[in-house]
């Protein structure tokens, strides 16, 4: 539990227990803005290093993501989404950038678990996997300007899908325990 607290994923409240982090709306926005900026930087560095095998791996992640959305399988969705982003991030060649982005992806995945409305019956159809296909196409075209705009739009949509509530959630309510 201390490891989760060190990673910023849970708050430990003495004599009460462990609770999933309870970020403010501003903290959530800060995490997404930083992640967007760092991923745009990584995308620029990775663009000429990506191979057809990478594009195939990214496409496979998109297929998994789409199926997980259809099946409302949040765990598989989060893994596929992280996989998609980390494929190009790892190609940037900057160890520190990779580590920072991976930490931010883990943090924003918690925010998705807490606040995303994709999996509610009334939510609109998800668009993220379609944007991922567009991102792959722009990498293949090596069109950095369009890719930066697409990534910005992608992160704006991600933030727009969140419903930030200011309340603690017990771990069991999220992890099924």
Predicted regions and their residues:
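Hydrophobic, amphipathic alpha-helical faces that serve as interaction scaffolds
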Residues: 34-49, 83-121
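C-terminal all-alpha effector/ligand-binding and dimerization domain
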Residues: 40, 61-62, 71, 83, ...
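Short linear motifs at protein or domain termini
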Residues: 1-48, 54, 96, 159, ...
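Exposed, interaction-prone assembly regions rather than primary DNA-binding/catalytic cores
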Residues: 65-85, 89
């Amino acid at each position: 539990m201390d490891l989760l607290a060190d990673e910023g994923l849970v708050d430990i409240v003495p004599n009460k227990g462990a609770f999933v982090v309870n970020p403010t709306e501003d903290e959530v926005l800060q995490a997404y803005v930083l992640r967007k900026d760092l991923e745009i930087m990584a995308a620029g560095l990775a663009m000429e290093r990506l191979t057809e095998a990478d594009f195939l791996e990214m496409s496979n992640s998109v297929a998994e993501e789409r199926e997980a959305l259809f099946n409302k399988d949040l765990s598989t969705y989060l893994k596929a989404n992280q996989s998609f982003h980390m494929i190009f991030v790892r190609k940037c060649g900057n160890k520190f950038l990779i580590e920072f982005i991976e930490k931010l992806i883990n943090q924003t995945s918690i925010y998705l678990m807490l606040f995303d409305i994709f999996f509610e019956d009334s939510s609109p159809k998800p668009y993220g996997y379609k944007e991922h296909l567009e991102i792959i196409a722009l990498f293949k075209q090596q069109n950095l300007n369009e890719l930066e705009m697409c990534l910005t739009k992608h992160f704006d949509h991600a933030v727009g899908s969140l419903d930030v509530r200011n309340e603690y959630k017990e771990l069991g309510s999220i992890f099924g325990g």
